[in-house]
């Protein structure tokens, strides 16, 4: 009886440790396929109605693990040729910092999508667009402890500012990245930086002492589709 009780306690403890170690195990979006391309113009086309989406974002800074001060919606779709990402960022128009900036400058209000395309939980691509439509990209290395800013992909991104906030659209061709064709899911995270109050907002939750970690990304699940373009 004691041995059985001990086994149960060990199993419960292990489950609690796993849950504590990665709060993002249940975070997942389905990558649904559409047949027509989306025009990258910062306007919300009807095709986005078919996309899986999330509003479940968390504040990392300045107030760790507190509710975000603004609402963010992220959506994702695919065609045979490319992944499409839409981010709807609600805000007071007068508080949006739309700095023109330079490529790879990461300036002003900016949103990002990060993709672990090999499922190794150590490397990922990062694609970012600021509120004025300037794009930036990089490779995340060593579980996001290091960055390779020299990497430049061939992809599209733009933004549009509205009275209620701004919209970012991205198109990432599969031929512009490397990936494991055998995988049915990739690692995924979204990020939003709000310059006005220096607020860093993530889809996934991280430990304050560590910061963002690829090993704790959520999932992007390929729904009846796997990319084959190289």
Language-model features: locations:
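Sec-dependent signal peptide recognition
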Residues: 2-10
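Structural preference for beta-rich elements and adjacent junctions enriched in aromatics
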Residues: 19-230
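Hydrophobic h-region of N-terminal signal peptides that target proteins for export
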Residues: 10-19
């Amino acid at each position: 009886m004691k041995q059985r009780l001990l086994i149960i306690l060990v199993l419960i403890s292990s489950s609690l440790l796993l849950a504590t170690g990665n709060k993002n195990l249940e975070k997942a979006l389905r990558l649904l396929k559409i047949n027509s391309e989306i025009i990258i113009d910062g306007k919300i086309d009807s095709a986005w109605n078919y996309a899986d989406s999330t509003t479940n974002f968390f504040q990392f800074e300045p107030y760790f693990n507190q509710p975000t001060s603004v609402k963010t919606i992220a959506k994702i779709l695919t065609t045979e040729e490319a992944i499409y990402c839409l981010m709807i960022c609600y805000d007071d128009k007068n508080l949006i910092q739309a700095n023109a900036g330079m490529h790879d400058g990461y300036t002003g209000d900016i949103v990002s999508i990060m993709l672990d395309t090999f499922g190794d939980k150590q490397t990922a691509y990062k694609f970012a667009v600021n509120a004025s439509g300037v794009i930036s990209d990089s490779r995340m290395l060593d579980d996001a402890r290091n960055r390779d800013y020299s990497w430049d992909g061939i992809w599209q991104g733009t933004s549009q500012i509205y009275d209620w906030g701004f919209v970012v659209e991205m198109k990432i061709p599969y031929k512009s990245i490397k990936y494991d064709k055998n995988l049915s899911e990739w690692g995924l995270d979204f990020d939003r930086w709000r310059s006005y109050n220096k607020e860093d907002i993530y889809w996934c939750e991280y430990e304050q002492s560590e910061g963002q970690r690829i090993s704790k990304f959520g999932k992007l699940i390929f729904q009846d589709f796997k990319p084959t373009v190289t």
